[in-house]
Amino acid sequence: MSGSRILLLEDDEDVAELLVLVLRGAGYMVDLAVNVAQADHRLAERDYELVVADWRLPDGDGIEIANRAAELGARTAILSGYALQMSPERSARHEIWMKPIRPTELIAAVERCLGKPRTPAAN
């Protein structure tokens, strides 16, 4: 499903740069947000097939953004080095990806996620 538009929410500059490079190299259109406020703005501007959000961010929680994106009909994933500490109740509706993630694992996870049926948007 290359060509799909992805929103990546990642506050670590080095991690973000690598993930964007890998995803764009695989043919995906990627928009980067470095904080929750920027991600909210991007979600209001455009539709995304997939939103990948870091869990712990300086100005909020990536799960909140993933929940909003899912309500808009996007597929969602949480990418975190702390994934094992997440509450199953809060993260149940999202894919959970562990950091660090290898480029081949990232692409496989994105392809798997995009191959799933979309969550219907809330009315």
Region locations from a protein language model:
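Two-component/phosphorelay signaling modules centered on CheY-like receiver
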Residues: 13-31
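C-terminal output helix
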Residues: 20, 86, 101-113, 118-123
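Acidic, metal-coordinating helix/loop segments flanking the phosphotransfer/catalytic sites
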Residues: 32-50
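Conserved acidic carboxylate
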Residues: 10
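Active-site residues of response regulator receiver
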Residues: 54
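Acidic catalytic/metal-coordinating carboxylates
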Residues: 35, 61-64
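Hydrophobic/aromatic residues positioned on beta-strands within the core alpha/beta folds
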Residues: 79-80
